[in-house]
C-alpha cells in the first residue's frame, strides 16, 4: 500500500514512520509513505496556510486552496482519485475492520489538520472518510495518521518484514 500524508509537518511523519518495524517495511517495499508539505502549495509569499473561517467563527483554519492543490498534485502523481481519510476528533472511531477496509486500497491519502481544523470547502471536495483515533483532541493529525499507517502492518494479509 502507498500512503500519501498531507501535513504541515512532513518531517514528523517521515521521522516517525522511517523507524522500527514501519521503517523496515518501507525499506522492504511492503508499504511506501510520502509526506506532502501543504505549505508548498500556498500561493502566499510567506507560505501562509491559515485564515479566518469562511463565514466567520473563532480561531483559524487551514485554507482550502493549498489543501485542494496538494490533493490535486497527488491525483496527478498516481493517476486516479484515491480515498482520502481526514483525521479529526469528530470522525468515526478507527477500528480493526476500518483498517482492513483501508488495506484494500492501493493508495490511501491521509489528511492531517491543524489550528481549528480545515476549511469546510476543502473537506467537502476531497474527503471520503472522517476518522478519529479516540475521544480526545490532539494538536494535529500527524500522530493519528501514523497510527493508521502502523495498523497496516498488523493485518494478516500484509507481508511480514
Q: What do the PLM-derived regions correspond to, one by one?
A:
Residues 2-40:
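Glycine-rich, flexible N-terminal cofactor/catalytic loop recognition
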Residues 4-6, 34-36, 85, 108-109, ...:
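Hydrophobic/aromatic beta-strand patches that form the interior of the parallel beta-sheet core
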Residues 49-69:
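Short, structured active-site "lid" loops
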Residues 63-114:
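S-adenosyl-L-methionine/SAH cofactor-binding core of RNA-modifying enzymes
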Residues 112, 130-141:
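Short beta->alpha connector loops at strand-helix junctions that form conserved
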Residues 116-123:
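Short, glycine/polar-rich helix-capping loops at beta-to-alpha or helix-loop-helix junctions
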Residues 151-157:
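Conserved small/polar residues in nucleotide/adenosyl-binding loops
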